[in-house]
Swiss-Prot record:
Name listed for the protein in its UniProt record: Elongation factor P
Record flagged with keyword Transport: no
Pfam families named in the record: EFP, EFP_N, Elong-fact-P_C
Gene label: efp
GO CC terms in record: cytoplasm
Lineage: Bacteria, Pseudomonadati, Pseudomonadota, Gammaproteobacteria, Candidatus Pseudothioglobaceae
Pathway: Protein biosynthesis; polypeptide chain elongation
Lipoprotein among keywords: no
Residues annotated with N6-(3,6-diaminohexanoyl)-5-hydroxylysine modification: 34
UniProt GO BP: peptide biosynthetic process
Localization of this protein: Cytoplasm
Length: 187
């Protein structure tokens, strides 16, 4: 596998750190008033999902992670596993609940998701940036409700709970930003 110098670090680069594949979230070059410059790098461990911050001096190298990202279409959940398919080769992937647990509320049938494979095993799933979900349960809207800073909690048809404006009612379809779990507008 390739080795990467800290000069080559950029957001999204996949590297091996402590025997686990990690993705760089942020790379900051720090030049103290006295002493040698160093890089403060924020990583996301692709296996555990934890965020790590490490510092590296110039001249250090890290091994690249042998991970593969595939665009797969979400098909269905059979109760125990989530089924995905490659839309080009029609190869199917069955992914366990542990891998899917953090994003299962954003999985909508037929949507294309990015599935990261390491040693031919799925280790993470990235849903589309925005999904359309239906409001399953929320407090009823009152006459005169308008868009404002306040909101109310709403449960979506997939089980996700998020803050929505006061005018949203049960049965409405809303656009949700999956990166920050926020209401993004009406569908």
């Amino acid at each position: 596998m390739d080795k990467y110098s800290i000069n080559q670090f950029k957001n999204g680069l996949k590297l091996m750190l402590d025997s686990n594949p990690c993705s760089i979230l942020n790379n900051e070059i720090v030049k103290p008033g006295k002493g040698q410059a160093f890089n403060r790098v924020k990583f996301k461990d692709l296996i555990t999902g934890k965020t790590l911050i490490k510092t590296f001096k110039s001249g250090e190298f890290l091994e690249g992670a042998d991970v593969m990202e595939l665009d797969l279409q979400y098909l269905y959940n059979d109760g125990n596993a989530w089924n995905f398919m490659d839309p080009h080769s029609f190869e199917q992937y069955i992914i366990d609940g542990i891998t899917v647990s953090s994003v299962k509320g954003y999985l909508v049938e037929q949507d294309i998701c990015i599935v990261t494979l390491w040693n031919d095993n799925p280790i993470s799933i990235t849903p589309p940036n925005h999904v359309i979900l239906e409001v399953f349960d929320t407090d009823p809207g009152l006459k005169g409700d308008t868009i404002g800073a306040s909101g109310k909690p709403a449960t979506m048809n997939t089980g996700v709970v998020l803050q929505v404006p006061l005018f949203v009612s049960i049965g409405d379809k809303v656009k949700v930003d999956t990166r920050i779990n926020e209401y993004a507008g009406r569908a």
